[in-house]
Amino acid sequence: LICHNRPLPFLHKTCPEGQNICYKMTLKKTPMKLSVKRGCAATCPSERPLVQVECCKTDKCNW
């Protein structure tokens, strides 16, 4: 699986074995959904009060 891991669309990495989910965290209270963090995970990270989490399982799907 290949996931974006930086704010820029052309920067990505191959996930380590066992990490089969791409995730993207964005701030909930901003008009443009400012991205906070992207990367690979074994399980989808939990949402937080001010952070929305989106998870997916295809290459580069977390843009």
Curated annotation (Swiss-Prot):
InterPro entries found in the cross-reference section: Cytotoxin_Cobra (IPR003572), Snake_3FTx (IPR003571), Snake_toxin-like_sf (IPR045860), Snake_toxin_con_site (IPR018354), Toxin_cobra-type (IPR054131)
GO MF assignments: toxin activity
Official protein name in the record: Cytotoxin homolog
Record's miscellaneous remark: Is classified as a P-type cytotoxin, since a proline residue stands at position 31 (Pro-31 in standard classification).
Role this protein plays: This toxin has a very low toxicity.
Sorted UniProt keywords: Cardiotoxin, Disulfide bond, Secreted, Toxin
Disulfide bond annotation, renumbered to this chain: 3-22, 15-40, 44-55, 56-61
Pfam families tied to this protein: Toxin_cobra-type
Family matches, as CDD domains: TFP_snake_toxin
GO cellular component, one term: extracellular region
Family under the similarity heading: Belongs to the three-finger toxin family. Short-chain subfamily. Orphan group XIV sub-subfamily.
Keyword Iron-sulfur found: no
Native organism: Hemachatus haemachatus
Main location, first listed in the record: secreted
Compartments in which it is found: Secreted
Tissue expression as described in the entry: Expressed by the venom gland.
